Amino acid sequence: MASIEFSPGIQEVPTQVRVLKSKTGNRGSAIFRFEDLKSDTQNILGMRMIDEEGELTTRNIRAKFLNGEFKALEVTYDMETEAEWDRFLRFMERFSAANQMGMA
């Protein structure tokens, strides 16, 4: 089963995922938005995407605040090669199936 974690053993589900690919097709990014976190937001250092193939990680995390109140985390996962892109898509297929997520 595929999962996303900020803290070991605490699975999270994003509110939104946007996937972007360059016009040349060489680079891509996935931007995850998390509004309702189970993890302690004070101790988040990175995001792990885990499935049967292994683990994908990123430390590109930004907290969003409104009037001093936490609203969301935005996490960016960058892909530099076609192999990284394909691996990410395989993870997202597994993750979306496990969490009843669809594409809009």
Swiss-Prot record:
InterPro entries: Psb28_c1_sf, PSII_Psb28_class-1. The keyword Cell membrane does not apply. Its main location: membrane. It is found in: Cellular thylakoid membrane. Keywords: Membrane, Photosynthesis, Photosystem II, Thylakoid. Coiled coil: none annotated. It is a peripheral membrane protein. The keyword Membrane applies. GO terms for cellular component: photosystem II oxygen evolving complex; plasma membrane-derived thylakoid membrane. GO terms for biological process: photosynthesis. Transmembrane segments: none annotated. It comes from the Bacteria. Part of the photosystem II complex. Belongs to the Psb28 family. This is Photosystem II reaction center Psb28 protein. It comes from Synechococcus sp. (strain JA-2-3B'a(2-13)). The lineage of its organism: Bacteria, Bacillati, Cyanobacteriota, Cyanophyceae, Synechococcales.
